[in-house]
Amino acid sequence: LSGLARKIADDPELELQIIATNMHLSPEFGLTYREIERQGFRINRKVEMLLSSDTANATGKSVGLATIGFSDAYEDLAPDMLLVLGDRYEILAAVTAALFYKIPVAHLHGGEVTEGAYDDAIRHAITKMSHLHFTSTEEYRRRVIQLGEQPERVFHVGAIGIDNIRHIDLLDKKVLEEQLDFPFDRKTVLVTYHPETLDAIPTGEQFRNLLEALDDRQDIRI
């Protein structure tokens, strides 16, 4: 959101207010709110919500804490509109609180699908509490409309992350090898894992299955 935030901040007719929350405020995850400040933005409010546990009980409590924190923030900041992106549970808390304050919500990246995860339910709930919708593809625009949103309020604008890619200074291979201490001397594969949060199989077991499959590929560096 940094590029869009910059455009809002530079517009003389608009006032940007930033609320930082969740992992941005956690030492365990690097206190990344500092990255926001290093880009020259002022954080107007920090909403503490993250409990140091990944259980269902802790996550539910974190959502409750976030809803309280965002309510307090809206009471003080009195925003005219809330701009949110995606399907994180802290965003669900933010728009839930905004609903009762009658704050219009602009939602980016609605209508998308993440199979096997809580994300779909959260994302669609955010859509139903939002007033303006900016989707990354025409297919997702149609899905938002299928959820009952007014077509004239749903806009296919593309993925906002593309703007960031266009402005990134890419590292060359040698510099990247030095920074990662990882030689690219043969075919290399970057592997990421997104757990299926709705699956009855524990996440650890799912991940072990992935590692076992990768063990069979001795011809590549992972």
Regions found by a protein language model. Name each.
Residues 1-9, 49-151:
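Active-site and donor-binding regions of nucleotide-sugar-utilizing enzymes
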Residues 11, 45, 57-64, 68, ...:
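PLP-dependent amino-acid enzyme catalytic core
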